[in-house]
């Protein structure tokens, strides 16, 4: 008999209970004990649900209060100096100091948070472990064991999930730039201890996540994997299920298959080609976990096709006794339960599956494999019907959108003049000071803003009253920015609920959920739109409020749009068309909006692409094609303006070195990037030398907005001085790392005042009186 299993379940709860508990704790309204009890209840509910769905191997230690990579760092004592940790179990205040920084308004006493970056090619963010060259590791507390015992007390024998030692090190950074893998022998005793204690407790299986197997690995990394698992195998351990996901294991398969582990998990949604070579080479006693249900998207599985794949594997293995049926990856990346969605279009709803439904699909496939098609005939018929109605829907496939795509030409992707010529015309139109100051876009969305939006949604206020409130907040924001002294203003985006949802709600082809939340980082949750059909813009989306804001001030106000690649990346995308095609549909819709903003008098239009690198395939061989169409889509959306209109863009935390040619080819007039946590390290990619230098203007973030800490003026000035060493003065803008929507005005006003003050001091240094 096969085993239905899961690699991980969403942490946040059906109603975002984790978010509520965390934010209450941070506000001083919930004790540490209360927070831990809320977490315990969430874990119990998750395990009960999975057991009820027929999941045989239920994961534990897939839950984290903030981030599972941070949990691993805390477990092995990888705490940087300065956070007050002196050994022993890491306290909750220290844990949150690492995650969020400390100090608040007391900047002098504050500590910065750990650097944050994207988890592979997803929109989940992890905290980057910071290691010393001679890092000492020690188990501070065996959290996997504690959570195994917690579940065991509820009569559930779970399979703990650990981030594997090699992936942990490759996801980390060292203070001196040395190779983290050099620390492997120091780290392995911690893993050996954790595994031995789990084995002694009667734990049968442990899931070891080594997602770096989906990357192009150097020989040293492959050798590290062999050394790590051979070392661990010499000790007392439960059976290990080695899990990789997000891309094919491909040329790392010989390494994975040679490791002394009891089982191997394959992502057969993104790595279907791995199956045949694994079936041909897998050991006679090794278990195989088949990731047949997409753990990263919301579409219902093709149960008949999945069952056929499971049968193929069973035939090759001589039966289903060594097979596990699973999602492709952790279900962290999808919403919890479709059953909560009572307002979805009834035509679209049958095409979808969230985490709960996906585990039901997993259990159904396992049952069909073991008992035959007849046992799941009703489920197979429902799956077939959903696929058929989606394929044949005239709402999904629109002839007008197809015709416009066919009519798009390469000329539509080219600006009239090169950047140098455009820069002169833009500066003539907007004579800004050296080191101009601005923000990235959004301003704090206070409880009053959220209450007003909710009141409109509930029908408690009308559109006129809502619009009056938005107009008031917008004018207040303009006046505040003028008083602070910012050079280029934003309207604040008070009318926007989310930088993707706001646009998707006004575009054809998008659907929205009420409870479709997924974790981005910590307590930050997003509800991605679902792109279910061809995309088109029925009417202008942002022009009204942009025009209104510009009418209130003589200073330039930026038009603010979310770019086509980010709209794609931060949505659940239809899987019946190539992603490139969907992105071009979005680009054409945004092109019309860009043209309308320019016609409304906006001199700067910012088209944000924070997810541009996030879409980069994990495998090098696949990247050129992605970058080609991603750049093409950005240019298709933006190359509609005159030379004296500036196109800005913004990108979030990422490693830019390997995509710099593509970023330059986007042909934006200015780019802002998140650099505060890395202390301008990311600027190295943009500085370059000669032809490799980024040709346009750059705004390196000087204030980490993901932390409540207020950076002092001296700190911002120091970062700007670092930036001046890498960039020409006429390239440098001064701005925060990201939008300010999630911060409050008590943090934002003094931080912006410090930012403007630092820019003025920098001007004085650069241009002495």
UniProtKB/Swiss-Prot annotation:
Catalytic activity from the UniProt record: 5-methyltetrahydropteroyltri-L-glutamate + L-homocysteine = tetrahydropteroyltri-L-glutamate + L-methionine
Record's keyword annotation contains Zinc: yes
Annotated residues for binding of L-methionine: 440-442, 493, 608
CDD domains: CIMS_C_terminal_like, CIMS_N_terminal_like
InterPro entries to which the protein is assigned, alphabetical: Cbl-indep_Met_Synth_N (IPR013215), Cobalamin-indep_Met_synthase (IPR006276), Met_Synth_C/arc (IPR002629), UROD/MetE-like_sf (IPR038071)
Disulfide bridge positions per record: none
Residue positions binding L-homocysteine: 440-442, 493, 608
Annotated catalytic residues: 706 (proton donor)
Cofactor note: Binds 1 zinc ion per subunit.
Binding-site positions, Zn(2+): 650, 652, 674, 738
Described function: Catalyzes the transfer of a methyl group from 5-methyltetrahydrofolate to homocysteine resulting in methionine formation.
HAMAP family: Meth_synth
Record family assignment: Belongs to the vitamin-B12 independent methionine synthase family.
Protein known as: 5-methyltetrahydropteroyltriglutamate--homocysteine methyltransferase
Record lineage: Bacteria, Pseudomonadati, Pseudomonadota, Alphaproteobacteria, Acetobacterales
């Amino acid at each position: 008999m096969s085993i239905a299993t899961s690699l991980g379940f969403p942490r946040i709860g059906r109603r975002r209970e984790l978010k509520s508990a965390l934010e209450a704790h941070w506000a001083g309204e919930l004790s540490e004990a209360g927070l831990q009890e809320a977490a315990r209840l969430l874990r119990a509910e998750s395990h009960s649900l999975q057991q009820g769905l027929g999941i045989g191997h239920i994961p534990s230690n897939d839950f984290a209060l903030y981030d599972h990579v941070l949990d691993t760092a805390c477990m092995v004592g990888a705490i940087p100096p300065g956070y007050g940790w002196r050994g022993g179990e890491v306290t909750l205040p220290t844990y949150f100091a690492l995650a969020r920084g400390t100090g608040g308004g007391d900047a002098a006493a504050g500590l910065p948070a750990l650097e944050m970056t994207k988890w592979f090619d997803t929109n989940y963010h992890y905290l980057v472990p910071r290691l010393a060259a001679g890092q000492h590791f020690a188990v501070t507390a065996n959290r996997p064991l504690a959570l195994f015992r917690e579940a065991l007390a509820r009569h559930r024998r779970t399979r703990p999930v650990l981030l594997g030692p090699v992936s942990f090190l490759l996801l980390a950074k060292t203070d001196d730039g040395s190779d983290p893998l050099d620390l492997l022998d120091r780290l392995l005793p911690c893993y050996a201890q954790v595994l031995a204690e789990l084995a002694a407790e009667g734990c049968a299986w442990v899931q070891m996540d080594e997602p770096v197997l989906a990357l192009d690995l150097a020989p040293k990394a492959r050798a590290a994997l062999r050394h790590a698992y051979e070392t661990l195998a010499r000790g007392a351990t439960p059976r290990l299920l080695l899990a990789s996901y997000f891309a094919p294991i491909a040329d790392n398969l010989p390494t994975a298959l040679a490791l002394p582990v009891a089982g191997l998990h394959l992502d057969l949604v993104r790595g279907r080609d791995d199956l045949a070579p694994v079936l041909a080479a897998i050991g006679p006693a090794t278990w195989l976990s088949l990731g047949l249900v997409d753990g990263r998207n919301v579409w219902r599985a093709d149960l008949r096709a999945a069952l056929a794949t499971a049968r193929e594997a069973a035939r090759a293995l001589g039966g289903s006794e060594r097979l596990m049926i699973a999602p492709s990856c952790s279900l962290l990346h999808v919403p919890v339960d479709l059953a909560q969605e009572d307002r979805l279009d009834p035509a679209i709803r049958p095409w979808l599956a969230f985490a709960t439904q996906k585990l039901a699909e997993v259990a159904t496939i396992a049952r069909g494999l073991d008992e035959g098609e007849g046992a799941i005939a009703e489920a197979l018929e429902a799956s077939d019907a959903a696929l058929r109605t989606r394929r044949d829907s005239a709402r999904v496939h629109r002839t007008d959108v197809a015709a416009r795509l066919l009519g798009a030409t390469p000329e539509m992707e080219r600006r009239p003049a090169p950047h140098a010529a455009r820069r002169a015309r833009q500066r003539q139109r907007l004579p800004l000071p050296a080191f101009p100051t601005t923000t990235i876009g959004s301003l704090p969305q206070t409880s009053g803003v959220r209450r007003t939006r909710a009141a409109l949604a509930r029908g408690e206020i009308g559109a006129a009253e809502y619009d009056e409130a938005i107009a008031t907040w917008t004018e207040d924001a303009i006046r505040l920015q003028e008083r602070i002294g910012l050079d280029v203003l934003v309207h604040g985006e008070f009318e926007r609920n989310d930088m993707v949802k706001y646009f998707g709600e006004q575009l054809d082809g998008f659907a929205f959920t009420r409870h479709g939340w997924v974790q981005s980082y910590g307590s930050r949750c997003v509800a991605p739109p679902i792109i279910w059909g061809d995309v088109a813009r029925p009417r202008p989306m942002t022009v009204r409020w942009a025009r209104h804001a510009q009418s209130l001030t003589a200073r330039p106000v930026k038009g603010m749009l979310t770019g086509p690649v980010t709209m794609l990346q931060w949505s659940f995308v239809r899987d019946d068309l190539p992603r490139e095609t969907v992105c071009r549909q979005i680009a054409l819709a945004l092109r019309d909006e860009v043209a309308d903003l320019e016609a409304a008098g906006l001199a700067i239009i910012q088209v944000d692409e924070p997810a541009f690198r996030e879409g980069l395939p994990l495998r090098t061989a696949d990247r050129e094609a992605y970058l080609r169409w991603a750049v093409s889509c950005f240019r298709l959306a933006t190359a509609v303006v005159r030379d004296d209109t500036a196109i800005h863009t913004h990108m979030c935390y990422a490693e830019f070195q390997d995509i710099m040619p593509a970023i330059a080819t986007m042909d934006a007039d200015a780019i802002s990037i998140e650099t505060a946590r890395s202390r301008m390290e990311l600027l190295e990619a943009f500085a370059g030398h000669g032809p490799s230098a980024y040709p346009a203007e750059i705004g390196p973030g000087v204030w980490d907005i993901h932390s409540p800490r207020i950076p002092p003026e001296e700190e911002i000035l120091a970062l700007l001085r670092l930036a001046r060493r890498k960039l020409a003065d006429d390239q440098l803008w001064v701005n925060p790392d990201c939008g300010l929507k999630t911060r409050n005005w008590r943090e934002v006003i003094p931080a912006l005042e410090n930012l403007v003050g630092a820019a003025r001091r920098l001007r004085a240094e650069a241009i002495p009186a």
